[in-house]
Amino acid sequence: MIIVTGGAGFIGSNIVKALNDKGITDILVVDNLKDGTKFVNLVDLNIADYMDKEDFLIQIMAGEEFGDVEAIFHEGACSSTTEWDGKYMMDNNYQYSKELLHYCLEREIPFLYASSAATYGGRTSDFIESREYEKPLNVYGYSKFLFDEYVRQILPEANSQIVGFRYFNVYGPREGHKGSMASVAFHLNTQLNNGESPKLFEGSENFKRDFVYVGDVADVNLWFLENGVSGIFNLGTGRAESFQAVADATLAYHKKGQIEYIPFPDKLKGRYQAFTQADLTNLRAAGYDKPFKTVAEGVTEYMAWLNRDA
């Protein structure tokens, strides 16, 4: 069995899909379906069982067994960069991850987990997986950073695989439940389909991010499980492309629309990553050599998926 926490969420459900594509269906999905809309991410997938995250954590802390577990993909977390309840964030992202890590170490179960590019904070260069480059801007980024630091202490002595992925700006299918945290491509598509003007912040040609397609993210996760490599790795494309490029690709797909530029909100000033670009040196050195989709390629594929029933 393979366990996927956050398996009804964005990246988790795409990992389940990638496993299904390889013929793997003996999957336990762990999530919190209080937001009942997330079920749509699983409705076309095949899994063996579902468990609520609170029940799962209780069983993990009690040392209960789940049969022959081949790996745990730990994607479950509070991923809102605008959530400022530090106790909630640390319980949900840090303590929970530690419990799961030790459970895996004791049983030598491969543990593959979601870190984040938010660990780098407001950098504009040198997004490198090393302490001197890390300075998160929000408590979400701090919770991810602190767990990475915890993992770094354990990695040299670990007898089983531990790998963390610093996700950059992931976009693609199965993110609709994320609301305001969904990607720009998702929101632009929704606005166009609602007959509204697609909106970007003023200066969006200058805001550049490393936008990585979720299908590529799932592929990297599965490659690492198959190859048993440990460590903490950036997971982006290695390219910074502008929000304007995302909009251009979206409008090109729809063949309509005129961007409306809106003022940059004061509340985001100083807390907004204006530039991200993954340094892929370590990922490539680990042996992962496949190309990543460009924004034009990924957004076009995503638009086709979003509008498949249109």
UniProtKB/Swiss-Prot annotation:
Pathway: Nucleotide-sugar biosynthesis; ADP-L-glycero-beta-D-manno-heptose biosynthesis; ADP-L-glycero-beta-D-manno-heptose from D-glycero-beta-D-manno-heptose 7-phosphate: step 4/4; Bacterial outer membrane biogenesis; LPS core biosynthesis
UniProt: NADP(+) binding residues: 10-11, 31-32, 38, 53, 75-79, 92, 144, 170, 178
Binding site for substrate: 169, 180, 187, 201-204, 209, 272
Catalytic activity: ADP-D-glycero-beta-D-manno-heptose = ADP-L-glycero-beta-D-manno-heptose
Impact reported for residue 140 to F: Severely compromises epimerase activity
Keyword field: Acetylation, Carbohydrate metabolism, Isomerase, Lipopolysaccharide biosynthesis, NAD, NADP, Stress response
Cofactor: NADP(+); NAD(+)
Bound cofactor: record note: Binds 1 NADP(+) per subunit. NAD(+) can substitute for NADP(+), but enzymatic activity is reduced.
Regulation: Completely inhibited by ADP and ADP-glucose, and partially inhibited by ATP and NADH.
pH dependence: Optimum pH is 5.5-9.5.
GO molecular function terms attached to this record: ADP-glyceromanno-heptose 6-epimerase activity; NADP+ binding
Temperature dependence: Optimum temperature is 42 degrees Celsius.
GO cellular component: cytosol; membrane
Entry-linked SUPFAM superfamilies: NAD(P)-binding Rossmann-fold domains
Consequence when changing residue 178 to M: Severely compromises epimerase activity
PTM sites of type N6-acetyllysine: 267
Outcome following mutation: residue 210 to N: Activity similar to that of the wild-type
Active site, per annotation: 140, 178
Pfam families cross-referenced by the UniProt entry: Epimerase (PF01370)
EC code: 5.1.3.20
Anything else known: Essential for E.coli viability at elevated temperatures. Insertional inactivation of the gene by the Tn5 transposon results in E.coli being unable to form colonies at temperatures above 43 degrees Celsius.
Record family assignment: Belongs to the NAD(P)-dependent epimerase/dehydratase family. HldD subfamily.
UniProt note: domains: Contains a large N-terminal NADP-binding domain associated with a modified Rossman fold, and a smaller C-terminal substrate-binding domain.
Oligomer status and interactors: Homopentamer.
Described purpose of this protein according to its UniProt entry: Catalyzes the interconversion between ADP-D-glycero-beta-D-manno-heptose and ADP-L-glycero-beta-D-manno-heptose via an epimerization at carbon 6 of the heptose.
Protein name (database record): ADP-L-glycero-D-manno-heptose-6-epimerase
Organism (species): Escherichia coli (strain K12)
